[in-house]
Every structure is written in C-alpha cells, then in structure tokens.
Amino acid sequence: MESGAYGAANAGGSFDLRRFLSQPQVVTRLVSMVLALIVFSCIFGEGYTNIHTSDQLYCVFNQNEDACRYGSAIGVLAFLASAFFLVVDAFFSQISNATDRKYLVIGDLLFSALWTFLWFVGFCFLTNQWAATKPQDVRVGADSARAAITFSFFSIFSWGVLASLAYQRYKAGVDAFIQNYVDPTPDPNTAYASYPSASVENYQQPPFTQNVETTEGYQPPPVY
C-alpha cells in the first residue's frame, strides 16, 4: 500500500499514469468493465430470438424476459459503476480530506460486495434458465447466451477481488488513524527519567558595592 490515508499517496502530488494503471484495483476494475460489457452486449445483441411459429421476439433464456432484463441490467450498471470508480481512483490522491476518502472507500466496498452477490445470483439464474431452454426454440444466439453465462461467472471473482481490495484500503486508513490520534499507553516497566540535580551556585557579591567595615572602639576626630 502507498503511504497516505486509505491506501493512496498524500494529496498534492502529480498524476502518474503508469503508477495509476499498475494499481491492483485499477487493473481489476478494467477487467470488470470488459466482462460487464461482454455480458450485456451478448444479451442486447443476440439475447432475443423468435420461434418457428411466430415472428415475435422472446428471450433466449427459456423465453423468460426477466432473465434477459436481469442480466442486461446488472451488466450495464456494473459497467457504469466501474467507470465511475475508475474516475474516483484517478483523482483519489488529489482528495485531501480524509473523511471524504473514507466515504468513497466505504462506497466502493459496499457496491463491490453487493455486485459480487448480484453476479452470483445472475449466473445461477441464467444457467438455470438456459438449462430449461428447448434446443428447437433457439434459432440464433446460443453462443451469445453461453458467453453471457461464462462471463457472469468470471464477474463474480473480479468483483469479489474489488471488494477485498476496498476492504484492505479501508482497514489501512483506520489503522493509520488509530496510530496518529490515539495516545500510546505508557509501559509500566519503563523507569521514569530522573530529574537533574539542582546545582548550588556560589554567592557572588554584586558589582559596584563597597565593603562596609565596622570597627569597634573610639576613633579621635581629625586634627586641623
């Protein structure tokens, strides 16, 4: 992890494209974008077909419109969300407020965890509907249907990795906050430092003073 709050460099640095593209969450997010693009493109392109006795288009997944709607919806939203968080990753190091960084990382964590679950549901749903589809009802789009199912399966892992990376950044930010703002507990075994001994300074007679000598006895007055 880079130094700084929530896994990013301190604010104020210049943007480094090579360093940005080498970040694990950026690479995984780009992969997730490509997978989502393939899924909804397959459904939009060849996810609807007609049967022999009708010209009306039906969803290729067992003629279940909900299957096509669900697969295309999570694919489009996953693509848009990946693009949004990719922009956030690009400008994340320019955000100086640690609270704003925390909320963005939490949003990334929650969304990635939710979409991991939704991709799992989508994979199971599409697989179930495809298994129930009659081969004679599929004139075109069989390969696209299989591709949508396959890349839905891969999306489960890509979004799971994104959730894990977001959690690591969140934990790094919390640990840094604790180290910086919580006073450490003193060690009872550590001896207290001794106070320096007071130095005794010799008394010095102040300047511009005369010694007053006192003599005992009578002194005769001067004779003129």
UniProtKB/Swiss-Prot annotation:
The keyword Phosphoprotein applies. Signal peptide: none annotated. Residues 20-171 form the MARVEL domain. Pfam families: MARVEL. The modification Phosphoserine is found at S3. Coiled coil: none annotated. The modification N-acetylmethionine is found at M1. GO terms for biological process: protein targeting; regulated exocytosis; synaptic vesicle membrane organization. It comes from the Eukaryota. It is found in: Cytoplasmic vesicle membrane; Cytoplasmic vesicle, Secretory vesicle, Synaptic vesicle membrane. May play a role in regulated exocytosis. In neuronal cells, modulates the localization of synaptophysin/SYP into synaptic-like microvesicles and may therefore play a role in the formation and/or the maturation of this vesicles. May also play a role in GLUT4 storage and transport to the plasma membrane. This is Synaptogyrin-2. The lineage of its organism: Eukaryota, Metazoa, Chordata, Craniata, Vertebrata.
